[in-house]
Amino acid sequence: MSDRPDRVHDQAASSSRDSMTSTPSISSSNAPATVPIRLRTSLPGCSIPYVPYMVPVTWRRSQLSTLVNKVLATAQGAGHEEASYKAVPFDFIVDGSLLRCSLDEYLEQRGQSAETTLELEYIRSTLPPAFKDAARQDDWVSSVDARHAHRILTASYDGIVRIFDSESLATSPPQSYTPAYASNVSLTSAKWLRNTADAIVTGSMSGTVAVWRVPGTETKSVPVLQAAELEHHTSPVSSIDVAVAATNASAERATIVSAGWDGSIALWDVPADARFETQEETGGAPGKKRRKQHGSDARPISSAIITPPPLMVLHHVTPSLGATAARALNTAPTPGPNARTIAALGDGDQRIWSAAWDGTVKYWDVVAGGGLAGRKQTDKVPLCLDPLQSLSLSSFTTPQLVCGHMDHSLALYDFRDAVSNAALAMSGAHAAPVSAVKVHPVSAHLFASGAYDGRIKVWDVRSPKQALFALSEPVSTSSKSSHMASSKQPRTKVLGLDWTPDGNALVSGGEDCRVCLYQGQAIGIEHV
């Protein structure tokens, strides 16, 4: 509103002062003490004059929200009826924390007087998502992917990938698929290759990364025979991430990044529809011309999938014994100490973010051939990460990364800052190790975290000292299920977490073998 005429500025300020005068029935001697405040916001179209407002020290969030709405209504109406303005609830951030008490209580806690001018930032208030539904599966849920509308993809330690319908989560059985390679192997991660819900990439405890197509709509467990196995990792795969780009009008390519307990990161380029080139092969000797075979001489003909090697391999933690030396010694490569690594893609497929149990956090420039572009060193053990998204028109996201740690903390790492390691440390964010973080798909300020304490929290980086709200996975999803845990059972670990594409719902899964859906409304909306 800085570009509004001065008369509108004066009218808005005058209206705000009028709204704060005591009613005639209250004598000035009994009027509450006042404190000067300044109000600012980053919400587009919601700024009010940045001038001191004298408000009663007894005011709380609701009265402050009324003040902002009154000034906005008067200024935006520019003399017209205020009835057309629709009030919006606001929250207020002071000194990096949401205001959850009266102004005088805040001043008392800080040992400040009412003469101090308080700087408050107002943001749109968000109601917490409410538990909507849940489904149970046979084993722990190791990861969830809710990026596809109305489809929830889960990986499980029983080696099965399941696809749930979010509209009928508890009532409709999931489509269940067992990749052929994972019949006796636990899956650690599963991601959609693209938004059409027909292609999937999985990671496993065996170190295999596999890309395959969903074979149909069966609701029973079926093997997937045409899985392209991407071979590199010599230890369990700890994380995978995917970015899709259109190379021409008819083809899409998917970039996959995988990270493992061996300390390495592999970057792969695959067809986004998971349709790989194949070559027919028989049981005959190689090099012989194939011919039609009959009778007892007939041998089975199969299609061998041509799988690509990694585009590049990065070592977040230098191996104690590398692949070349291991081959010379006729032994297996040996990872370095604390080599367990996680990774994610940023800026589409132009950056790779990674963190390892050795306490290092890095990002790599893929365009420059995988060169190390930034490094942070901490005394923490990272368990999960997700890059913050930028809503600007810039082609690059802000080089910031959210990490969850073994010591129950969260941290924001800003690679624009060459001095400090953690730009924002959030100690005691949970009561147990933080196992999952997920940045909001719409808002540049919000992210969610899940932990071994069974809690899910939503945070605003503008108010890092406390979560916006905390959710708990319900102990029982159905009163008809007698085998469910009792209400006295301690909370179980959250292992997977994701937002739906519109950012209005959270999906979680974990140790309790359940997939839970929490539905909200207008979460992360940055306008009025």
Curated annotation (Swiss-Prot):
Disulfide bonds: none annotated. Signal peptide: none annotated. Residues 1-32, 276-304 are annotated as: Disordered. One of its GO terms (biological process) is maturation of LSU-rRNA from tricistronic rRNA transcript (SSU-rRNA, 5.8S rRNA, LSU-rRNA). WD repeats lie at residues 136-174, 182-222, 232-278, 334-374, 383-423, 429-469, 489-528. Residues 1-10 have a biased composition (Basic and acidic residues). GO terms for cellular component: nucleolus; nucleoplasm; preribosome, large subunit precursor. InterPro entries: G-protein_beta_WD-40_rep, NLE, WD40/YVTN_repeat-like_dom_sf, WD40_repeat_CS, WD40_repeat_dom_sf, WD40_rpt, WDR12/Ytm1. Keywords: Nucleus, Repeat, Ribosome biogenesis, rRNA processing, WD repeat. Gene3D superfamilies: YVTN repeat-like/Quinoprotein amine dehydrogenase (2.130.10.10). PROSITE patterns: WD_REPEATS_1, WD_REPEATS_2, WD_REPEATS_REGION. Residues 33-124 are annotated as: Ubiquitin-like (UBL) domain. It is found in: Nucleus, Nucleolus; Nucleus, Nucleoplasm. GO terms for molecular function: ribonucleoprotein complex binding. Its main location: nucleus. Residues 14-29 have a biased composition (Low complexity). Component of the NOP7 complex, which is required for maturation of the 25S and 5.8S ribosomal RNAs and formation of the 60S ribosome. PANTHER family: RIBOSOME BIOGENESIS PROTEIN WDR12, WD40 REPEAT PROTEIN 12, 37. Belongs to the WD repeat WDR12/YTM1 family. This is Ribosome biogenesis protein YTM1. The gene is YTM1.
